[in-house]
Amino acid sequence: MSQQAAAVTKVTFKVTLTSDPKLPFRVFSVPEEAPFTAVLKFAAEEFKVPAQTSAIITNDGVGINPQQIAGNVFLKHGSELRLIPRDRVGGISRAR
């Protein structure tokens, strides 16, 4: 293992799937320099939901722009995030 590979700094995220009533979560570590789009795709694959129609938000409900690196997201928003399929965003439940 090279010294350069050993020096890679990682950040750890706990991602919860909000569309499941049981609120399952996954914890994973990624390189600090990883594009957050890759984190979103990986999290979506872990929960078997389509990445193209999913978003990651904070526990406070703030949307996260995926066009940044994982380290910046970690510094701005912390480690606890939520994965939400976009078909659930702004949806209105109508009882008939």
Swiss-Prot record:
Propeptide part(s) removed at maturation, as residue ranges: 91-96
Glycyl lysine isopeptide (Gly-Lys) (interchain with K-? in acceptor proteins) crosslink location in chain: 90
Cited Gene3D superfamilies: Phosphatidylinositol 3-kinase Catalytic Subunit, Chain A, domain 1 (3.10.20.90)
Keyword Secreted: no
InterPro entries hit by this protein: Ubiquitin-like_domsf (IPR029071), UFM1 (IPR005375)
Keywords: Isopeptide bond, Ubl conjugation pathway
Alphabetical list of CDD domains matching this protein: Ubl_UFM1 (cd01766)
One Pfam match: Ufm1
GO biological process terms held by the UniProt record: protein ufmylation
Highest rank taxon of the organism: Eukaryota
Ranges in a coiled coil: none
Similarity comment text for this entry: Belongs to the UFM1 family.
Role noted for this protein: Ubiquitin-like modifier protein which binds to a number of as yet unidentified target proteins.
Descriptive protein name: Ubiquitin-fold modifier 1
Taxonomic source organism: Chlamydomonas reinhardtii (Chlamydomonas smithii)
